[in-house]
């Protein structure tokens, strides 16, 4: 997989990171900066927290959610084993703005995959989001910070105002992308978004 370059990411202070770690461990939701907007996230195997994300967004639970990670190792347990050719294909695109649909392992909660048998995963190239995943020691559910059908939120302040105490909002800067990630089904090669 490609390695990221550029300036070192700004990260929330260690106290705020400890609060974020506790929030996730306790089944809570955080808001954090990503490539194109703020995202809402939780631990990917915590079905209760995933349902909380869906409720905050008023998002239908059949759609499924994306998981981002700092590297493939953080998502390996979420997907069925991949062939060497499939891993090589992913390495061509990651880290980067490409989300792939991969066959989900049995461990993946239905609330995360929705009505699908695959899971949407991305190794992010956004320095702050990748560093956050590393520091928190987990991949993160990543869905735009907004209510379904509304504009994605672009600042920590907007998230704090919108979600109040339902979400722990971390300071950060969104990336320069204006569109959401491209979604590709790895098995068929079909571009879905």
Curated annotation (Swiss-Prot):
Localisation: Cytoplasm
Database matches in Gene3D superfamilies: DHBP synthase (3.90.870.10)
GO cellular component terms listed in the entry, alphabetical order: cytoplasm
Entry superkingdom: Bacteria
GO molecular function: ATP binding; double-stranded RNA binding; L-threonylcarbamoyladenylate synthase; tRNA binding
YrdC-like domain mapped to chain residues: 14-193
Catalytic activity: L-threonine + hydrogencarbonate + ATP = L-threonylcarbamoyladenylate + diphosphate + H2O
First-tier enzyme category under EC: transferase
Key words of the record: ATP-binding, Cytoplasm, Nucleotide-binding, Nucleotidyltransferase, Transferase, tRNA processing
InterPro entries assigned: DHBP_synth_RibB-like_a/b_dom, Sua5-like_dom, TC-AMP_synthase, TC-AMP_synthase_SUA5
EC number: 2.7.7.87
Predominant place of localization: cytoplasm
One example of a Gene Ontology biological process annotation: regulation of translational fidelity
Pfam families noted in UniProt: Sua5_yciO_yrdC
Membership in a protein family: Belongs to the SUA5 family. TsaC subfamily.
Role summary: Required for the formation of a threonylcarbamoyl group on adenosine at position 37 (t(6)A37) in tRNAs that read codons beginning with adenine. Catalyzes the conversion of L-threonine, HCO(3)(-)/CO(2) and ATP to give threonylcarbamoyl-AMP (TC-AMP) as the acyladenylate intermediate, with the release of diphosphate.
Official protein name in the record: Threonylcarbamoyl-AMP synthase
Gene for this chain: tsaC
């Amino acid at each position: 997989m490609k390695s990221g370059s550029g300036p070192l990411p700004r990260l929330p202070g260690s106290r705020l990171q400890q609060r974020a770690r506790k929030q996730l461990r306790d089944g809570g939701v955080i808001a954090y900066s990503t490539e194109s907007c703020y995202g809402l996230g939780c631990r990917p195997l915590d079905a209760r927290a995933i349902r909380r994300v869906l409720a905050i967004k008023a998002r239908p639970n059949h759609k499924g959610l994306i998981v981002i990670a700092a590297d493939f190792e953080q998502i390996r347990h979420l997907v069925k084993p991949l062939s060497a050719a499939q891993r090589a294909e992913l390495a061509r695109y990651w880290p980067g703005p490409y989300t792939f649909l991969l066959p989900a392992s049995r461990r993946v909660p239905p609330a995360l995959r929705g009505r699908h048998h695959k899971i949407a995963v991305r190794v992010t190239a956004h320095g702050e989001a990748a560093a956050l995943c590393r520091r928190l020691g987990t991949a993160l559910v990543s869905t735009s910070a907004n209510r379904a059908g509304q504009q994605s939120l672009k600042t920590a302040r907007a998230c704090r105002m919108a979600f109040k105490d339902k979400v722990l909002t971390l300071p950060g800067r969104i990336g320069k992308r204006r569109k959401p990630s491209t979604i590709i089904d790895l098995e068929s090669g079909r571009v879905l978004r």
